[in-house]
């Protein structure tokens, strides 16, 4: 049997509501040895965990070198943006106008497509997984609607975790890297 002992550091960050609009954040850091360790971050009942087996330093040093995007991808399944399905009908209308101006649609095709969008308010999922209605099939690219630049909106969970990581990064910064 092999027994290894490590030191665990727990940090509680309070009074950050004014500067970062966050509730208290707790951070638990465990460095297993050179280049291996884990971190657990909790805030308002949610927690995020990351483990790295070969990061070339301590967790504290590693956090200074990597981006929030990398950390969020490793610690949570959040994307920077998410589909804005509320804007799908407006997007289709703008696409009808654009293709009409470009001469790809004649007046009657554009009018029929516009009426269809007004009457049925189709969303991207119904067009991805269903049969494309004849009124919208005249739009160039509608045979493969997943390639359209559908509208997205910022993912609030991603932004929230990014703000937390900014605070954690500043607090766990090694002493020689801290700003005075």
Language-model regions, residue ranges each:
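A eukaryote-biased signal for long
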Residues: 102-180
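Aromatic- and glycine-enriched beta-alpha-beta binding-site module
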Residues: 32-77
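Short N-terminal edge-element motif at the start of the domain
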Residues: 1-46
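An exposed acidic His-Trp-rich patch
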Residues: 62-116
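Hydrophobic, Leu/Ile/Phe/Ala-enriched alpha-helical segments that form helix-helix packing faces
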Residues: 1-2, 15, 63, 75, ...
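Residues in flexible loops and secondary-structure boundaries
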Residues: 19-21, 49, 79, 83
């Amino acid at each position: 049997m092999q027994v290894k002992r490590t030191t665990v550091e727990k940090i509680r960050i309070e009074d950050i509501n004014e500067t970062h609009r966050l509730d208290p954040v707790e951070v638990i850091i465990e460095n297993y040895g050179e280049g291996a360790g884990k971190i657990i971050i909790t805030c308002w009942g949610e927690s995020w965990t990351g483990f790295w087996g070969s990061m070339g330093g301590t967790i504290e040093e590693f956090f200074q070198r990597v981006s929030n995007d990398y950390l969020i991808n490793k610690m949570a399944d959040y994307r920077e943006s998410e589909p804005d399905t509320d804007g799908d009908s407006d997007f289709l209308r703008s696409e009808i106008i654009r293709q009409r101006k470009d001469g790809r649609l004649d007046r009657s095709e554009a009018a029929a497509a516009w009426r269809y969008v007004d009457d049925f308010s189709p969303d991207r999922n119904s067009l991805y997984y269903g049969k494309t209605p004849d009124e919208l099939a005249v739009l160039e690219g509608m045979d493969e609607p997943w390639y359209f630049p559908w509208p997205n909106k910022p993912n609030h969970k991603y932004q929230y975790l990014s703000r937390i990581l900014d605070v954690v990064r500043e607090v766990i910064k090694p002493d020689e890297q801290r700003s005075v």
